[in-house]
């Protein structure tokens, strides 16, 4: 590569020999160039000399004194078809001090596709002349070329010569040359990167006329977007204010585009820009406000959204359909149905023509909240407005009616769809089929399924899932399993919902082994269980007494990346509570709090019970007080748990204090509350107090239950007044309260303690006749009664009967049998002495 110097005469003599025979003194027609013939002759001569490579420096007294700068550029242009010759001539002219135009040689090279060479020549110019050289040169020698201008701008930007790049752009636009958008954007980026936003503001009007709108992003929008992306918010806002104060025209459309981008994740910056627009222009329109209203609604900041809505109205801008629908939808999604409906009514009152989408979404909100009455009102208003429902509207109403159990009304809506020539969607069918299945009408559900197939609608996994769930809830598990296999035959992939339905169905039938088989199938089919799956399987393990397995499943959820919900925690906590392992239950509750899972009042009630089981009275009291002072209101179960807990630990004064608090609640004491207190009074032999409490129950309208009567009967049975127990037993039956096996056991126990074993046996038979299954307590009472009076054979027979019915003896019964030591041959399994018939 050559590095040029205009003072290097030695180089000139080496590279350019005399060529007097080639060139003659030329007569120019005028100052702008050669005649056509002379130009061609000069170009041909130079081309020949350069190709032969045998010329020295042109004679300075002849050529140098007559060939001016503009003439040099004309020679370059005449060599356009021979770019290599033109390049060598350009270099000679540069060395000769002719100051050839770089624009001209760039024009020649680019026209011939020699972009890399042009880049190198520009680099040479920078090396020799520095960044201050005249890039355009004698540009007036030829009309501007957009490609060359683009090239020069990009070269200048590459070297940080952003002011020269802008100069080229401005000059070209003044002459009507349109620079490609991408080049203008790159120049703007370079100006912004060089912190020369002031130059953009100075020439903003030229940039706006530079052809980058309306097909592209405006200069204003581009600059703001770039500055905001760099985090230079203040500079962006200052730029906007500057161009507005200088009187440049900025369209509100440009501002709206910037606001839309900012409202996604920079809502506060968008708010500042809007404030500036309101302060210095341009005049906002309804889209401007709707953009930010939508941004606030998506963030749930409804107060700010509504404030902006009011500002829009105050500035005389009438909200349109988009404004109202955006704000209404925001209120509904935030659960503020009242405000949403108020705005909905306001829009109708002001004559805003709400469309079917707004009406349908409004109906959908009320359907989802269970307020079908209001949904119907909105539907009627829609019809009054002359707006025809579409399939989506009808489907939403069908779903709501099905959820409300009004399946035949829903089917009527389905008829409306067909009558109006509309095509039901797959969601329409799934909603109706689900409605039929949930009301137990599987036949109609499957009939609709068949109709759907006949009409050419292929059922999806949702439809199949609904039908499988319907079969499972009806206990038709073999049909449910076969239908699931049919899904696989249709190449429909089973999902977790289908498996959950099957597992739940087997659990309802107490077929836990089958439920676990389905659970294992999920792994075979590559279906990942969800929290609901694990919770159901945990219940299976708990019901079979396998708490460790349930705990393993619980922690397996964490290993699989699942977050157990409140129901999963509650299921396990309650299980450990019932199995007298309160410490583990409390540890699980602590884990629940650490994982920030919100506990409902049911979980809190279990925790209170656990605390009392662990004798942590102060903690239970503190927990209860926190509930009262916090957002979660204790329910009747909470109060009853507290009263029962204090009573179990003989803290009757505290129990009475909670009882007094309960009296002033909106719900007050119930039957369970009074039964707890009656039980405590009976245990403390305060029969007068227990009878008085029983009377209060009748006065307050609380109906005693079998447990209430059982407490009183137990006290009478253990005292000398066994007849009192009989009277209460008869009274309970007269009032239509069915005695439980516990009630019968109390009477049997009282009779056995008095040696009235035959009467006790009759009562035992009455319990069986009443379809009650005697538990180990009932059997143990009567067996011990037989043993006490020496009727060991009958005791053995009853024991054998107990085993045949699947009731396992407890430790208390085993000790009683050991004490009376009946003959082993009587107690051996399989021996049956038929001296007295026993009930089957």
Swiss-Prot record:
Gene3D superfamilies: Tetratricopeptide repeat domain
Keywords, in A-Z order: Repeat
InterPro entries per record: Pentatricopeptide_rpt, PPR/CCM1_RNA-binding, TPR-like_helical_dom_sf
Family (UniProt): Belongs to the PPR family. P subfamily.
Superkingdom in the source lineage: Eukaryota
Coiled coil: none
Name listed for the protein in its UniProt record: Putative pentatricopeptide repeat-containing protein At1g31840
PROSITE patterns (alphabetical): PPR
Claim: Repeat is one of the keywords in the record: yes
Pfam families xref list: PPR, PPR_2
PPR repeat copies, ranges: 98-128, 145-179, 180-214, 216-250, 251-284, 285-319, 320-354, 355-389, 390-424, 425-459, 460-494, 495-529, 530-564, 565-599, 600-634, 635-669, 670-704, 705-739, 740-774, 775-809
Annotated disulfide bonds: none
